[in-house]
Amino acid sequence: MSGSFDRKLSSILTDISSSLSCHAGSKDSPTLPESSVTDLGYYSAPQHDYYSGQPYGQTVNPYTYHHQFNLNGLAGTGAYSPKSEYTYGASYRQYGAYREQPLPAQDPVSVKEEPEAEVRMVNGKPKKVRKPRTIYSSYQLAALQRRFQKAQYLALPERAELAAQLGLTQTQVKIWFQNRRSKFKKLYKNGEVPLEHSPNNSDSMACNSPPSPALWDTSSHSTPAPARSQLPPPLPYSASPSYLDDPTNSWYHAQNLSGPHLQQQPPQPATLHHASPGPPPNPGAVY
């Protein structure tokens, strides 16, 4: 009785020792024993770098894993933070200065605004106030007049040069030439301007044409008209009833009938170089 009990006790002890030895070696074994599947404490223990201190079944933050390599020797071993700056190579970093530099402030485009004419109310009606008239000195007027006699129209460089010489603006020179041309046209139209002050070849109004002679100076430029008095006057047609009543009486028929009578007529004067066809003969002389 005692011998069988001792054998059973020894077998139970060997089973317990074998089970304990299996649990102790399961940590180093690559395979898990069947009894460890239901053991929840196994998963809570630190087993890998990715799940250190993390319970099983929780979401893993992608920025908390450890990396074991360096990028171009610039980053050390450690955990990534969500807002950390990535380490790019030197070829990419040289373009970072263009992104970080602020854009230069552009100057606003200056637009010249013409001053508006002052408007005053006169008798309840708006009326623009005229600008004061430009007062030219005697030297400026003499220089402008001399230049106007040379050419009534100025090109842009010539106008700028003349304005700089006289101390005027280009607008003042342009307005003076416009007023002077209108005054000259009015005087020239009324005949108060002599012929030598007419527009010359340099003026675009002249169109490079010679000046026309005056109306009172036609004796030197007149040409003799051809003397038409030397031609004999044409003979009038006869309105005899025999010529009007007979429609078949033509010029050729009358010429054949009045051959002897036409020979008795005096010949044409010899002063004529070009023989012109004479009028038809008088049919009234033929009976």
Curated annotation (Swiss-Prot):
Main location: nucleus
Gene Ontology molecular functions: chromatin binding; DNA binding; DNA-binding transcription activator activity, RNA polymerase II-specific; DNA-binding transcription factor activity; DNA-binding transcription factor activity, RNA polymerase II-specific; RNA polymerase II cis-regulatory region sequence-specific DNA binding; sequence-specific double-stranded DNA binding; transcription cis-regulatory region binding
UniProt-listed SUPFAM superfamilies: Homeodomain-like
Top-rank lineage group of the source organism: Eukaryota
Residue segments, region Interaction with DNA: 131-181
Transmembrane segments: none
Cellular component terms per the entry's GO annotation: chromatin; cytoplasm; nucleus
Region (Disordered): 20-39, 195-287
Protein keywords: Activator, Amelogenesis imperfecta, Cytoplasm, Developmental protein, DNA-binding, Homeobox, Nucleus, Transcription, Transcription regulation
InterPro entries to which the protein is assigned, alphabetical: Distal-less_Homeobox_TF, Distal-less_N, HD, HD_metazoa, Homeobox_CS, Homeodomain-like_sf, HTH_motif
Bias-annotated ranges (Polar residues): 28-38, 198-209, 247-265
Residue spans of biased composition, Pro residues class: 277-287
Disulfide bonds: none
GO process terms (BP): blood vessel development; BMP signaling pathway; embryonic skeletal system development; epithelial cell differentiation; gene expression; hair cell differentiation; hair follicle cell proliferation; hair follicle morphogenesis
Cellular location(s): Nucleus; Cytoplasm
Pfam name, any one: DLL_N
DNA-binding segment(s): 129-188
Disease affiliated with this protein: Trichodentoosseous syndrome: An autosomal dominant disease characterized by curly kinky hair at birth, enamel hypoplasia, taurodontism, thickening of cortical bones and variable expression of craniofacial morphology.
Assembly and oligomerization: Heterodimer with MEIS1. Interacts with IPO7; the interaction facilitates nuclear translocation of DLX3 in dental papilla cells.
Protein family: Belongs to the distal-less homeobox family.
General function of this protein: Transcriptional activator. Activates transcription of GNRHR, via binding to the downstream activin regulatory element (DARE) in the gene promoter.
Protein name: Homeobox protein DLX-3
